[in-house]
């Protein structure tokens, strides 16, 4: 629910702000460090967590304007989960609500050796950015896709020219992706030799 109120905290924090965009109160935080959940409030300003702790606001306080307040109702509050093996098309389903519904806020795409079949993956990523996406995205380039783009496909034999082309494409793509993914049980990746994989790994 949305509320607009003016409060002044009984403890000193956030001296540089006069407005709190979101205040989550009365929750139990699991921070991922391994320690037990602890009672706390969370203060968010301009989409950033700026304070974690008990704010101890009172009805007579008035310093900060709170735009939105959520009662945690003694429920658990956790960081967003990272899905290390995801599949999806953000150009078709940019909201990614299926991930958000499970608490996932970061996904990885380009798994199993398959990424969008475009020579310049950065342009595809620009399209995703322009369209907007509901989660954070860590993008990988697929080994099988590189084989197809280089004209190697399912072949067991690779000449120097095509191998060089694949390595050049990988080298360029790694400038803006998180790495190379493989799917060696799928075509065309299952046709790769150990020597090919070693050369790719060197990049």
Describe these PLM feature segments:
Residues 32, 112, 185:
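Flexible loop residues that form catalytic
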Residues 193:
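Active-site-proximal loop/hinge segments that shape catalytic or ion-binding/gating pockets
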Residues 13-22, 29-79:
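Histidine-rich, glycine-flanked metal-binding segment
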Residues 27, 86:
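Active-site metal-binding loops of divalent metal-dependent hydrolases
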